[in-house]
Amino acid sequence: MEFSIKQSPLSVQSVVKCIKMKQAPEILGSANGKTPSCEVNRECSVFLSKAQLSSSLQEGVMQKFNGHDALPFIPADKLKDLTSRVFNGEPGAHDAKLRFESQEMKGIGTPPNTTPIKNGSPEIKLKITKTYMNGKPLFESSICGDSAADVSQSEENGQKPENKARRNRKRSIKYDSLLEQGLVEAALVSKISSPSDKKIPAKKESCPNTGRDKDHLLKYNVGDLVWSKVSGYPWWPCMVSADPLLHSYTKLKGQKKSARQYHVQFFGDAPERAWIFEKSLVAFEGEGQFEKLCQESAKQAPTKAEKIKLLKPISGKLRAQWEMGIVQAEEAASMSVEERKAKFTFLYVGDQLHLNPQVAKEAGIAAESLGEMAESSGVSEEAAENPKSVREECIPMKRRRRAKLCSSAETLESHPDIGKSTPQKTAEADPRRGVGSPPGRKKTTVSMPRSRKGDAASQFLVFCQKHRDEVVAEHPDASGEEIEELLRSQWSLLSEKQRARYNTKFALVAPVQAEEDSGNVNGKKRNHTKRIQDPTEDAEAEDTPRKRLRTDKHSLRKRDTITDKTARTSSYKAMEAASSLKSQAATKNLSDACKPLKKRNRASTAASSALGFSKSSSPSASLTENEVSDSPGDEPSESPYESADETQTEVSVSSKKSERGVTAKKEYVCQLCEKPGSLLLCEGPCCGAFHLACLGLSRRPEGRFTCSECASGIHSCFVCKESKTDVKRCVVTQCGKFYHEACVKKYPLTVFESRGFRCPLHSCVSCHASNPSNPRPSKGKMMRCVRCPVAYHSGDACLAAGCSVIASNSIICTAHFTARKGKRHHAHVNVSWCFVCSKGGSLLCCESCPAAFHPDCLNIEMPDGSWFCNDCRAGKKLHFQDIIWVKLGNYRWWPAEVCHPKNVPPNIQKMKHEIGEFPVFFFGSKDYYWTHQARVFPYMEGDRGSRYQGVRGIGRVFKNALQEAEARFREIKLQREARETQESERKPPPYKHIKVNKPYGKVQIYTADISEIPKCNCKPTDENPCGFDSECLNRMLMFECHPQVCPAGEFCQNQCFTKRQYPETKIIKTDGKGWGLVAKRDIRKGEFVNEYVGELIDEEECMARIKHAHENDITHFYMLTIDKDRIIDAGPKGNYSRFMNHSCQPNCETLKWTVNGDTRVGLFAVCDIPAGTELTFNYNLDCLGNEKTVCRCGASNCSGFLGDRPKTSTTLSSEEKGKKTKKKTRRRRAKGEGKRQSEDECFRCGDGGQLVLCDRKFCTKAYHLSCLGLGKRPFGKWECPWHHCDVCGKPSTSFCHLCPNSFCKEHQDGTAFSCTPDGRSYCCEHDLGAASVRSTKTEKPPPEPGKPKGKRRRRRGWRRVTEGK
């Protein structure tokens, strides 16, 4: 369509963006000088023929469109080539143009605006009463050609006054800026999609800038190849394409319409599309560009964890689809744009999205014919061939054009194959799909059945009653018949699943099932039981209660105003009967294909569909219209699970919100059958829950119910299950568990208090095992075992692999695994080597895991009965994503990864397994199997497994498995370190903040009598009485003045300890030193900084705490000694001074002051400290052990270790001189010279283990203590018996090279020695065969230095004990 507007001769021709213009009279004036009306006549004529596009605007003046400034990204002079573009993508409108003709063109050198008519096609003139686009008026101005001007003038002359007033009201309707933009962009798409448009000769004269390339308008066009980035997925190859609903490939997004989006389709084996922001697109150049894009994305990552995530390789789940997309993209890059669009553009048939048959065939996917597609999607051939039905001819042109748009807007649905995992995101959202349930997702909640419960007529009435108000609000001038036609056109576009939403659920009388779904399980107020819907259960279970996720405010508001809306819409006779019958819920939810997405997302009401919570392998699964990329103008989604066209209001209790632990109500489990459900709660002290059937009851008892144990008063111990009267209850109110004191003491997590004990069910075993000093184990939501006192935090991070989850807060832990007879993989297996020295021998085996040790390696005696290793006693269990070694069948120990049951294939999930078993993924072979703790042990960095790896067969597979396991181990380690670092940087470790010292145990705080407190000579009239610069006697003696004794009284300035007058400080995270304390203001030299506050303990308690810290790997100490009997421990309790770090050149020092008779420690500045400087003091650490802690203070005189004296100036100068002196040249030793490596076996018995090494130079012999007849290691320098005569103890001269027998010169004559072929002697206790066998393990006598054979590390003194590798 072409439109022309006559302008003044002084105007300059340019193309306008839209039709409705508001200009000042001097800018857009008529020829006679009169100001035309800013509102142009609504009646218009449309000319469907070729014509030139010309319009004139005042040069240099910013145009105003609908009262708004023109959009900056498309200036008026860039729309000159609209003349050859298809209007809104309509078929048959390739020659339609918009033309504005001037009334007078005098003085302008442009040819007359004639309308060239196509040969054989007469000029068609249609009078449009109203035109709609997306449910809104498209043109509201009068657009007149030469022939239409007379018609408009005649109509204006014949108008009645009331018609004029009505027309003026219509003019006040504001034109939607989004539709204005959509008009222009639709025309741009049409221009690009029609390559055969003919050039108009008059075009170059009237629009001199028409030939400018379209790339100046938009960065990408249809057919362009790009990389797109979707959150959580790698860069993916795409092609820009037109949206089937909007008929445009680009649009503006955000509140200010300042962020541009492009519609792209993803390459791969599944047809998927999305709207992506321009900043998330990069032009495609080839596969080699991928690494560069990943590096650039990582540079912009806000956190280290995000950077690691962006740089990690593509997961195996996405690799195949991504590689297929790369192949298709590179193939498309070699084609022309037209060939590319013809081959790779998706087919939109009915309400389904399909791959091009040629592409599907190449991808190995069975492609349907177009006829089958149309038949399956419900599109009739008749409607496809004859889009203009007889009924459509009766519809006015405005509505007909609206219907055309809606009929061509086909909603999409992803490929039904759940195995597809290419990127997908239906921006306009598939109306047939449930909210947040893309392909591959499970629907874990109760969804509406697909079958319709009412006939089509009743459903249509509900649909009309629901959406009639919105249509009326948007088209106030439409009649009732027109409203009904619009609703019918929208109804015809809905799929069967969408229509099923408008069943009697929205009627005045609710069905019985709606009442059943109300969630009222039983009438008892105290019973908070909620039935958890298991993901494997039927999705149509009717007895599952539902939980309200969000209440629609529009729905609540409209229920209150039903009568008002009924009265307001009663004038529409065609819909009056339907409205009066169905008037319960009037909510805003227009058709998905006919309403802007953002508005639909906000205004749509509750749609009964399922939420899928399992993570999809496709980026489109997590990418909705509201979260394509983080544009600053983007509006946030109301819910993370909202799709583009419908909102979810109800989900079952198995929602992700419940999985995150948001629900605070406890879910009870029957104590007899260990299953949830409708339970009867005991109101006694046990707080138990029971099924009526388990108790043998048919109905709920009246009045107060108590179980048999509470009624008798004899409870059973939760550990040993014996019923006795000496059991005690846990002090936690809601716990209700009873224990024998001896039984509960066996668990290290039991906390004894003055009023009783807190049982282990209130602390996480995993958190305590990993860090016993961390108070976190007792915080957070717990999942507790129903059979024993074991609990874990909710979530996969703490929950042990193999636990059976029976409710949201109840499990059966792995300790209850029962091995079945006849199943070989249930048998317990132990390794055949020691976990310490890696040698065989007599091993002590753990009864719970495969670990084995030499008793000597653990420095213990061989225990009697069953024995458990330290890890098993501490409660350490395997967790998901742990890398382990697994023993299965006759195979060697094989590296594998612990998997979550929901992440393994369905056939593995269905395998029969017991409580305590978990699935593992074997590296190399890519197999899965169920195993348990007794056949696995953790993988450690550097493990190599079997030394016989080979290059063929299973040996090569094992070698690949080791490489994969090592890579996966490092990847998981980095992820966990990044997560721990992020958590630790949030806030300092917890402690209790106190203001004054708190005595602990027998320690007392001294308080002096007022008469004993010294009195200073200061006067209240002094400038600074008792101040920092005064001559206060108490300050000089480091006594604090007492307010009742000091002559200065309230003016005394020597009460910093009592008044806690500290300068303002703050806690910061330092580099390499943990947390530190910095000053927020300048501090003068000698000024009081802080008091060192904590618990006052005695030396006995101090040593006990240090011992406990060493046993539990606690390396941080906060102890400061006041005197022999009192020590300040600021670890569990303290103030900000506990965060001050050590420095060898500190800016603060500790001084002991006497405050009210008691000695207290203060920190004072030793120099002027500017603001922002870290506060430090010298710890003067007293080391109790031999290990030293490295000092990281960075001072010039740093001693290198905490506790060592800092280097003095003399020491530093001597070190400088020593550096300057010439170093003596040393002779380079030959390889192996001067080194001594001990043997790995005992020289007497020949076995390995914990050995004592000989201190004689060049001697490599080692012995067991038992072989030497010693009970403990010898002290000091020790020489083995081989160097001393067996008879007299003198130095030996004759040696047996097979045993420690040796003799001096006096006694060697009576001993028979023989020689081996290599010249080595041996005593008579050995025969020649043994000599030949063991001769390779012997050395020459000590006088002759032999070559070291073993790989033992040299140690000093009696501590030289071999350790196996």
From Swiss-Prot:
Low complexity bias spans: 606-622
Annotated Basic and acidic residues bias: 552-567
Feature: compositional bias, Acidic residues: 632-648
Annotated residues for binding of Zn(2+) 2: C1026, C1041, C1046, C1052
Zinc finger annotations (PHD-type) as residue ranges: 667-713, 714-770, 831-875, 1239-1286
Residue ranges constituting the PWWP domain according to the UniProt record: 222-286, 880-942
GO molecular function: chromatin binding; histone H3 methyltransferase activity; histone H3K36 dimethyltransferase activity; histone H3K36 methyltransferase activity; histone H3K36 trimethyltransferase activity; histone H4K20 methyltransferase activity; sequence-specific DNA binding; zinc ion binding
This enzyme's EC code(s): 2.1.1.357
Keyword NAD tagged: no
Keyword Flavoprotein: no
Modified sites of kind Phosphothreonine: T110, T114, T422, T544
Compartments (UniProt record): Nucleus; Chromosome
Residue numbers binding S-adenosyl-L-methionine: W1075, T1115, H1116, F1117, Y1118, N1141, H1142, N1186, R1192
Compositionally biased intervals (Polar residues): 580-590
Outcome recorded upon mutating S1137F: In RAUST; decreased histone methyltransferase activity H3-K36 specific
Binding-site list for Zn(2+) 1: C1016, C1018, C1026, C1032
UniProt-listed CDD domains: HMG-box_NSD2, PHD1_NSD1_2, PHD2_NSD2, PHD3_NSD2, PHD5_NSD2, PWWP_NSD2_rpt1, PWWP_NSD2_rpt2, SET_NSD2
Catalyzed reactions: L-lysyl(36)-[histone H3] + S-adenosyl-L-methionine = N(6)-methyl-L-lysyl(36)-[histone H3] + S-adenosyl-L-homocysteine + H(+); L-lysyl(36)-[histone H3] + 2 S-adenosyl-L-methionine = N(6),N(6)-dimethyl-L-lysyl(36)-[histone H3] + 2 S-adenosyl-L-homocysteine + 2 H(+)
Domain SET: 1063-1180
Modification Phosphoserine occurs at: S121, S172, S376, S614
Predominant location category: nucleus
DNA-binding segment(s): 453-521
PROSITE patterns the record matches: AWS (PS51215), HMG_BOX_2 (PS50118), POST_SET (PS50868), PWWP (PS50812), SET (PS50280), ZF_PHD_1 (PS01359), ZF_PHD_2 (PS50016)
Subunit structure: Interacts with HDAC1. Interacts (via PHD-type zinc fingers 1, 2 and 3) with SALL1. Interacts (via PHD-type 1, 2 and 3) with SALL4. Interacts with NANOG. Interacts with OGT. Interacts (via HMG box) with NKX2-5.
Name used for this protein in its record: Histone-lysine N-methyltransferase NSD2
Natural source organism: Homo sapiens (Human)
